[in-house]
Amino acid sequence: MVNDVFIQGFTAALIAGLITGVGGFMIFLKKKYSREYINVMLNIAAGIMLAASFFSLLSPSLEGILRFVPDRHVAGYWFVGALFSGVVLVWLLNALLPHEHNSAGHHGPNISLRSCWLFIIAISIHKLPEGLAVGVAYSGDELYNPLSLVVGIALQNIPEGLTVAISLVGAGYSRLKAALYASCTGLVQPIGALIGISIMEMNEKIVPIGMALAGGTLLFVIINEILPETYNTKKSQKSAAAVFLGFAVMAYLSIVLE
């Protein structure tokens, strides 16, 4: 029988995933978006996810581990081990489903269809651990705050949806098809949520470990996938300010939604 945790976690991840479509349909608002504009939006999204990782996953994870493992040294080993396990998980996903980074190309008018779809696969791959994080967060008790995490992921999905739509238009798709395909990339997140909940339902002691693992996956995605593609070294202050703005907004929301 499906319990409330499955329903809530799946629904939350589905809503956050569908928000990707908001970004996708933004392709109709302007004839052309500059690369700088998209990069600033993605830098803000990276800051949002950094804050969501710390405030909604890593911090409560450490508190949860300390409840079950009083020895702080041992708790630290568990926490760091789970964190790096999340990194390994994403690395394995990337290795099993190879893709290429495609920052410059997805703004051009004549990108190759192969490059376009490899870029979309990359976006979809990293939405799986985001959904996993939502599922893990909903599996916890009152110590955890899944709402702020869901809001953070939803906000991040908007510029990503727009980026995918721009990539598809550049490959020759109509704006409507581009927006619809961009929306579909978010549907990976509820699948990840169901996986996360299923694993966490086995034992409540696994939940804080799972939170740290999920935090590791998100941090690696941000550091390895998003920032290298969008951080402008020629305008580093603007890029840094955008990341900090996103972090500050999410930090505020984490406090308000607590």
Regions found by a protein language model. Give the residues of each.
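Intrinsically disordered, metal-sensing/regulatory segments
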Residues: 1-258
